[in-house]
Regions:
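Small-residue-enriched alpha-helical segments and adjacent helix-cap loops
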Residues: 535-565
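Long, compositionally biased, glycine/small-hydrophobic-enriched stretches that function as flexible linkers
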Residues: 1-214, 369-517, 521-533, 539-543, ...
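Short, solvent-exposed amphipathic alpha-helical segments in soluble enzyme
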Residues: 263-265, 328-333, 413-417, 522, ...
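Residue-level detector of anion-binding/catalytic polar loops
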Residues: 268, 333, 396
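Glycine-rich, charged/polar anion/phosphate-binding loops
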Residues: 321-324, 383-384, 514-518, 562-566
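Glycine-rich beta-alpha junction loops
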Residues: 276, 318-321, 340-345, 401-407, ...
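Active-site/ligand-binding-proximal alpha/beta "capping" segment
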Residues: 313-341, 345-348
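Catalytic or ion-translocation cores adjacent to nucleophile or general acid/base/metal-coordination motifs
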Residues: 203-226, 230, 237, 242-245, ...
């Protein structure tokens, strides 16, 4: 393969017509960059690297116009015509099954029904992109067609570096996104790098090519709400949230799961969302039952459903701060309260401040960023004040890992910090991982395992649902019972958006058992090939002190060793696709997060990889949590060591006596 032939084939012919944009499809707002003229020249040269010189004169002004109007060069002209969908794998070209499978995943991430801003390659989370521009998309797709089982495709922040010789037990694709050098690992430098075309914000499963629609977070949200009810509201383990009110904000790519998860958990929910198009998406999918722009109507509906003990998801089209004011003024009791606005990028459109409409937010981002930032800070401070008032009235508030509390701190509220000074010791309100998901799920190894049926057939998804259910013992732990019920009812709950996929929280041994069963089913011709994966938001996949590792209390919550070891270990053991990103769901410099994809083709080679990689991917996180003295992780490691004593051994801590430690420190500080 010659480079000039490859580039000529993709970009050298007659330029495709500049596309028209389908009405009703959301578009990304202008992105911040603050480039100098020299930077603009660099951005232009960087984009033109993909294009044969004969087209430079025509495309240079076009790319420059995109940079000025959008803050980024997207190369819209090179987007394929029409809508993209994750098609059945047999409809893709490729020299190996992994190359074709990755094409399914990429196109599913950019489906109009799935992606937040599909024309700008944003899958979810306001800024989470598959890659930076449509030239990269075309080149990645071409490399995936050429990829063999003796090669690995390397992708750096959306740029396909090339194909490199490897072997059958190597990853077929290795991805990294936004990994900044420490002194430049901040939002301003990232924005500049992204505008230059050298950095991509992959979020988690956007740039990791593993998004399965908002279903991917429904199970985690369901678990969080259910366990919040058990731990904070005194609900028995065999009951749900019937008769309870949950209030939150956001109905986007990830936050869109909130209403559906609350409904499955039995609750009544009111979810505020400023963008009516996102509400209509969830309403048409059946993920919210009703919508209104009236406070009184939303509350009236909620009271009716609470009295009837019926679950119901209500979308309120308006600002959550206004909604909370109304609830307080009218003495409406809220049982559970959270927020899922995109506060990892509050000043880039992720948080719409009180007092302006969604349309005004977009205009201010383009025309008056300074005013917008002031409005965001003012709104966040008041939002915090309202949460404090509801907390006094008996509401349980938790940060849903979207950097909301950090955004409040950045807006100038120092009293939100436990130490009253800075964020090093955490915040006065817990994150959902710190209080709920960490100790109840992650510490045992339960996390967001998922699979996608590459055939695109409903019968394959039905068969895998049944097989997964057979692998779960509902009497082992209450978590297993919850997971059993989840997958049993998954089809009835109509969770699929995009390709035929399923999310199912499982622990290390559960994941391996299900994975091996699926591969056996592929081998026997019972189902077509399957792509396994998980969210980066998992037991061992992410280091993030404000979210995934917020219940790590030995001081190592600020370290990123675990996520990197998890990523490297998955590469060493032969996972089909591995990804490592900066920022996750909390923002640049606040997280290092990784994930994987594993194609099940029915081979014994895949059985071997699964037997090594699946336990590692989860237990590397449980091991770190056990070393941090987390009790549930210690008991899980003891069980694992005993069950795997011929092959594995995880180091366990000796627990020091608190009185001895305090006495010793005091004596030396007299």
């Amino acid at each position: 393969m010659k480079n000039e032939d490859l580039i000529e084939r993709l970009f050298g012919g007659e330029l495709p017509p500049y596309p028209s944009f389908k009405e009703g499809i959301r578009r990304a707002p202008h992105r911040e960059s603050h480039l100098s003229e020299a930077d603009m020249e660099l951005a232009l040269k960087n984009a033109l690297r993909y294009i044969p010189k004969k087209h430079h004169e025509a495309l240079a002004p076009e790319f420059m116009r995109e940079l000025k109007e959008h803050g980024r060069i997207y190369g819209y002209r090179f987007r394929p015509e029409g809508e993209l969908h994750g098609k059945p794998i047999d409809e893709y070209e490729g020299r190996c099954i992994e190359g074709r499978a990755c094409q399914v995943m990429i196109d599913n991430n950019l489906d109009f029904d799935v992606a937040l801003y599909p024309y700008e390659l944003v899958t979810y989370g306001e800024t989470g992109q598959v890659c930076q521009n449509w030239m990269q998309y075309r080149l990645i797709k071409e490399y995936l067609k050429e990829l063999t089982q003796e090669q690995t495709l390397v992708v750096e922040s959306g740029h396909p570096l090339g194909l490199f010789r490897s072997h059958k037990f190597s990853p077929r694709v290795i991805i990294s996104n936004g990994l900044m050098v420490g002194m430049f690992d901040n939002q301003a430098d990232f924005n500049r790098a992204a505008a230059l075309g050298v950095a991509n914000y992959g979020q988690m499963t956007a740039g990791g090519w593993m998004y399965i629609g908002p279903q991917g977070i429904v199970h985690g949200t369901f678990n969080t709400l259910l366990n919040a009810g058990r731990l904070k509201l005194g609900i028995p383990q065999n009951e749900d949230l019937t008769g309870r009110l949950f209030v939150s904000a956001g109905l986007g790519g990830m936050s869109g799961a909130q209403g559906k998860a609350a409904e499955i958990a039995g609750a009544v929910s009111i979810i505020a969302e400023v963008d009516i198009s996102r509400i209509m998406t969830r309403y048409e999918q059946g993920w919210v039952n009703r919508y209104t722009d009236s406070f009184a109507q939303a509350v009236e509906w909620a009271k009716e459903e609470l009295a009837a003990k019926r679950p119901c998801a209500i979308a309120y089209n308006g600002n959550v701060v206004d909604l909370l004011e109304y609830l307080i003024e009218n003495n409406v009791h809220v049982d559970l309260l959270s927020d899922q606005t995109s506060c990892h990028v509050p000043y880039d459109g992720g948080y719409c401040p009180q007092g302006i409409t969604f349309e005004e937010r977009t205009r201010l981002l383009d025309e008056d960023k300074e005013t917008f930032v002031k409005l965001v800070n003012k709104s966040l401070v008041h939002h915090y004040e309202l949460i404090c008032e509801l907390d006094k009235r008996g509401t349980y508030f938790f940060d849903y890992g979207n950097s909301f509390l950090k955004a409040v701190y950045d807006a100038g509220v120092k009293e939100i910090c436990k130490n009253g000074v800075d964020e090093k010791d955490g915040f006065i309100f817990p994150s959902y991982v710190e209080d709920i998901l960490g100790p109840q799920l992650f510490d045992y190894g339960y996390g967001p395992f998922r699979w996608l049926c590459l055939s695109g057939k409903q019968e394959d998804l039905d068969a895998t649902d049944r097989a997964a259910m057979e692998c779960i013992d509902p009497n082992r732990r209450y978590q297993d019972r919850d997971n059993y019920v989840w997958v049993r009812d998954a089809k009835k709950n109509k969770l699929v958006v995009g390709t035929k996929a399923r999310i199912l929280y499982q622990d290390a041994m559960g994941r391996m058992k299900i994975a091996l069963k699926f591969n056996e089913m592929v081998r026997n011709g019972e189902i077509g090939p399957v792509m396994l994966g998980r969210d980066h938001h998992d037991t061992g996949g992410t280091d993030s002190p404000f979210r995934e590792t917020s219940n790590i209390k030995d001081g190592s919550n600020i370290m990123a060793d675990m996520a990197i070891q998890c990523y490297a270990g998955n590469a060493a053991r032969g996972m089909s696709l591995i990804a490592l990103h900066n920022g996750g769901g909390v923002g640049i410099g606040k997280s290092i997060n990784g994930g994987f994809g594993m194609v099940l083709d029915g081979s014994e080679r895949v059985d071997t990889i699964l037997s090594m990689a699946m336990p590692w991917d989860t237990m590397c996180g449980v091991a770190r949590r056990a070393w941090a003295r987390n009790e549930n992780s210690i008991s899980t490691v003891i069980e694992y060591n005993e069950a795997n004593k011929l092959t594995d051994h995880i180091t366990l801590p000796n627990i020091a006596c608190d009185e001895l430690v305090k006495k010793t420190v005091k004596e030396f500080n007299k």
